[in-house]
Amino acid sequence: MSTNSFHDYVDLKSRTNTRQFSDDEEFTTPPKLSNFGSALLSHTEKTSASEILSSHNNDKIANRLEEMDRSSSRSHPPPSMGNLTSGHTSTSSHSTLFGRYLRNNHQTSMTTMNTSDIEINVGNSLDKSFERIRNLRQNMKEDITAKYAERRSKRFLISNRTTKLGPAKRAMTLTNIFDEDVPNSPNQPINARETVELPLEDSHQTNFKETKRNTDYDSIDFGDLNPIQYIKKHNLPTSDLPLISQIYFDKQREENRQAALRKHSSRELLYKSRSSSSSLSSNNLLANKDNSITSNNGSQPRRKVSTGSSSSKSSIEIRRALKENIDTSNNSNFNSPIHKIYKGISRNKDSDSEKREVLRNISINANHADNLLQQENKRLKRSLDDAITNENINSKNLEVFYHRPAPKPPVTKKVEIVEPAKSASLSNNRNIITVNDSQYEKIELLGRGGSSRVYKVKGSGNRVYALKRVSFDAFDDSSIDGFKGEIELLEKLKDQKRVIQLLDYEMGDGLLYLIMECGDHDLSQILNQRSGMPLDFNFVRFYTKEMLLCIKVVHDAGIVHSDLKPANFVLVKGILKIIDFGIANAVPEHTVNIYRETQIGTPNYMAPEALVAMNYTQNSENQHEGNKWKVGRPSDMWSCGCIIYQMIYGKPPYGSFQGQNRLLAIMNPDVKIPFPEHTSNNEKIPKSAIELMKACLYRNPDKRWTVDKVLSSTFLQPFMISGSIMEDLIRNAVRYGSEKPHISQDDLNDVVDTVLRKFADYKI
């Protein structure tokens, strides 16, 4: 065999093997299920055949080259060329380069010629010619070996991918299963696909085939084992793995096929049952459909005997039973054939559903098939119910096909309780509150207390307001009077800038809505934010003055607030305003105090006189007055002094007491309020500030300062005197004393008053 013919043969063989292992072949028939075992066995046998063929071809090439070498040596017998090819002819073909490569599935190192015995004569031209021939032959061998190794590696990669992954699986329809037989069934010979006739047979290949023939694995029961686990369990040789794998996958394929047949049979049964039950209206139509069913049964594809084989029989039985049921009208409703057959179908459907549950993981379209099956079950039940209804009607009168209309339901009288419409009510949206036909949208909850809540709302034009919602007992006259009094006071102080403005209000059954200005922050929030910060008397002086201005407006209007606390002073656009006149009341013109029958105010800021009962008179008619509480303008000044005390010391005067002890401490005159000169952070407190707090916190209401006097105190109106003025004052005082060593008390008082009048010009 020449070199060109050898190359052509190797190329042809490579293309043949490549086509065998390729996945891109053209399918003329519907795609089949993959057979991993068949592919593995075919690859093993083809590999062994190709190895033998390659070894024989390589032996022929080696012998051919050896004969050429001998002929050349006979024609030119140089004495030094006797052992030229001894390295290749002394061993068998299996020890050559090709034999080593084929037996080991990887490329070995290139062999070199044994030229230890060759004697080279450099001066002889004939030796040079033979040397070139020998080099040419060696290059040719290396070229052939390299090409063969490259093709061999390509075939190995293709075959390895095919045997591991197998050809691509393709979904099969039920029609393909019934119209054509499944290839590679267990009865088919294993070597049916081997069509290549090998010219040479090796003993290794013959023994391999005989081993496959002699071993009988038809009765294998794998159970839950795979082929590899089965071989390990029974200590079988690994050479039998392809055959066992093929048997394993053949059995799996047969089980899938049987499962598909059973599923198809159950669908066919349901479909035919539905079509039969829907044809109960006409006897002629039933006869025609019997003929069509008979013709359809004759044209059905050949399949194995399974549950589907009884589907056509069951459908014919259903039709015959339905005919008999229509012809015989004396049968009872519940013992009629249609009920019996329906029960039989239900039992078959239950058994089929159990089988489908087992095969759910095998079918590739299980979910879709189950949905279709459920729809068919529903349609079948509806059709059977219609058939039973029609059968009952036909048993009575075959000419009547309509139902008697149902009787009208008895007329019942309904009693509706209509609630009175509220002028201010919640709309369908819980965030919308309507007050006097104006809608307000709730934004957030600002605060709550008792039975009232204050919301931040948004009205027309995106303006922000404060909405106070108060719920009360509609039959409590005192509550209603209190709310009316608050509204009257706000109406009275409507034009005052230091009082929160009442914009709108509405009182319904048990609900009161007040629309007022919305503040940015209250004084309690400001004090909490400044807790822990260094004491700033300018801050204390500013907010004390703002607070007193609000109280002055209320007192000038003859009103006692009675519940002054930091939370009732709100900043509205930078101006501090007073709010919450819920328990305030006007002071009669003939007195400075008012009396209440209930305790009012916040305990931390309540005056002692608001807690101590008055000494009632001896008059029996006025004994009930001993339970009343005395409140007046001085009570508001006590509350104001408590707020100033909290701004300086960080807590109210009686803040160290808890619960009931706090009330007892306020009423007990022996419990003195401390006024330290330094704070807890060792910050010095001016004497003017201590003097102001003491003036507001006298236990005797008559000794407390009024609002006007507190506003004119030295703490709020300090002197701003420079150093030069103080120097001039000292010089003048010394000069005046030296000139008049003896001065009377009256003259001294006149001098002091004059100096103070001049200092008044330097007040802030």
Swiss-Prot record:
The keyword ATP-binding applies. Residues 201-216 have a biased composition (Basic and acidic residues). One of its GO terms (cellular component) is peroxisome. ATP binds at L446, G447, R448, G449, G450, S451, S452, R453, V454, K468. One of its GO terms (biological process) is sister chromatid biorientation. Residues 85-95, 272-292, 306-315 have a biased composition (Low complexity). The active site is at D563. It catalyses: L-seryl-[protein] + ATP = O-phospho-L-seryl-[protein] + ADP + H(+); L-threonyl-[protein] + ATP = O-phospho-L-threonyl-[protein] + ADP + H(+); L-tyrosyl-[protein] + ATP = O-phospho-L-tyrosyl-[protein] + ADP + H(+). It is an enzyme of class 2 (transferase). Changing D580A: Loss of activity. Keywords: ATP-binding, Kinase, Nucleotide-binding, Phosphoprotein, Serine/threonine-protein kinase, Transferase. Autophosphorylated. Residues 440-720 form the Protein kinase domain. It holds the Pfam family Pkinase. GO terms for molecular function: ATP binding; kinetochore binding; MAP kinase kinase activity; protein kinase activity; protein serine kinase activity; protein serine/threonine kinase activity; protein serine/threonine/tyrosine kinase activity; protein tyrosine kinase activity. Its EC number is 2.7.12.2. Residues 66-95, 197-216, 258-316 are annotated as: Disordered. Involved in mitotic spindle assembly checkpoint signaling, a process that delays anaphase until chromosomes are bioriented on the spindle, and in the repair of incorrect mitotic kinetochore-spindle microtubule attachments. Phosphorylates SPC105 on MELT motifs; phosphorylation is required for recruitment of the BUB1-BUB3 complex to kinetochores. Phosphorylates CNN1, which contributes to the enrichment of CNN1 on anaphase kinetochores. Implicated in spindle pole body (SPD) duplication. Phosphorylates the SPC29 and SPC110 spindle pole body components. Belongs to the protein kinase superfamily. Ser/Thr protein kinase family. This is Serine/threonine-protein kinase MPS1. It comes from Saccharomyces cerevisiae (strain ATCC 204508 / S288c).
